[in-house]
UniProtKB/Swiss-Prot annotation:
Gene3D superfamilies, per database record: K Homology domain, type 1 (3.30.1370.10)
This protein's GO CC annotations: cytoplasm; nucleolus
Keywords: Cytoplasm, Nucleus, Ribosome biogenesis, RNA-binding
InterPro entries the record matches: KH-I_PNO1_first, KH_dom, KH_dom_type_1_sf, KH_PNO1_2nd
Family: Belongs to the PNO1 family.
Domain KH: 180-232
Biased composition (Pro residues): 1-14
Organism: Chaetomium thermophilum (strain DSM 1495 / CBS 144.50 / IMI 039719) (Thermochaetoides thermophila)
Protein name: Pre-rRNA-processing protein PNO1
């Protein structure tokens, strides 16, 4: 055992492992890679991207404007829509009797139609054969016109003519102080004896009028509806039928001159 005051000897260093010698083959590969990298950096054409093929190039005309392929006609995606038109109870029997006269809804508008007797309504639905976007609304107007009381032939005119409209108003809105007796008298003044006054207004203004209780429905062109409404309002307010007839004759003569 050495003395405590003796000098300590440093521990022996571990034997260093000899590094593996690089073979000649690895040296050759390193030299080749270095030479290729240097050639790539010095070559100006090496960094350019590959040229596009003729297929990817955009075709242009003589003025330099691009030419595109003609567009294809693609049918738009149509959403199936439905309409449910309620039918008053007093019009259900007329609807059943005239149901065979409803082919224009299928032939002209290309709609699917069915009568829901339990719910008392007519249901319309567009299909893949429906061409016009307005066909469903035209069919709904047709059924609504029949439900209001118009004749089936007059309602079919809504499908064939785009210039026809329906306007409704209440007699009580014209004269709000009408009592039960005054309301019946106003309706009688509009209709006339055996319906002569109503027919005279229809023939002079080329419209169709339906009296349903206190409601008045007018079918016709926009200007014609305005003239018929003025005549009806005059009768409700108490104008003499003779004066209204004279105004209708003037209106009829003006319409003949215009057309």
């Amino acid at each position: 055992m050495p003395a405590p005051t003796a000098l300590k000897q440093p521990p022996p260093a571990p034997e260093q492992q000899a590094a593996p010698a690089i073979t000649n083959e690895n040296e050759d590969e390193l030299l080749i890679d270095i030479q290729q990298a240097a050639a790539t950096l010095t070559d100006p054409n090496a960094a350019e991207p590959p040229e596009e093929t003729m297929e990817n190039e955009m075709a242009v005309d003589e003025e330099g404007r691009p030419r595109f392929a003609p567009g294809k006609n693609i049918d738009p995606i149509r959403r199936i829509e439905t309409r449910k038109i309620p039918i008053p109870p007093h019009r259900m029997s007329a609807l059943k009797a005239n149901w065979t006269k409803y082919p224009p809804l299928v032939d002209h508008c290309k709609l699917q139609v069915r009568m829901n007797i339990k719910e008392k309504r007519v249901e319309l639905r567009s299909s893949k054969y429906t061409v016009s976007n307005e066909a469903l609304q035209m069919g709904a107007d047709f059924v609504s016109a029949f439900a209001m009381g118009f004749d089936i032939d007059d309602a079919i005119a809504l499908l064939r003519l785009d210039s026809l409209y329906i306007q409704s108003f209440d007699i009580k809105d014209v004269r709000q102080t009408l009592g039960p007796d005054a309301l019946s008298r106003a309706i009688g003044r509009i209709a006339g004896k055996d319906g002569k006054t109503k027919f005279a207004i229809e023939n002079a203004t080329k419209t169709r009028i339906v009296l349903a209780g206190s409601k008045v429905h007018i079918l016709g062109a926009f200007e014609n509806i305005g003239m018929a409404r003025e005549s009806i309002v005059s009768l409700v307010l108490g104008a003499q039928p003779g004066k209204v007839y004279n105004n209708l004759r003037i209106i009829a003569s003006r319409m003949k001159e215009r057309w």
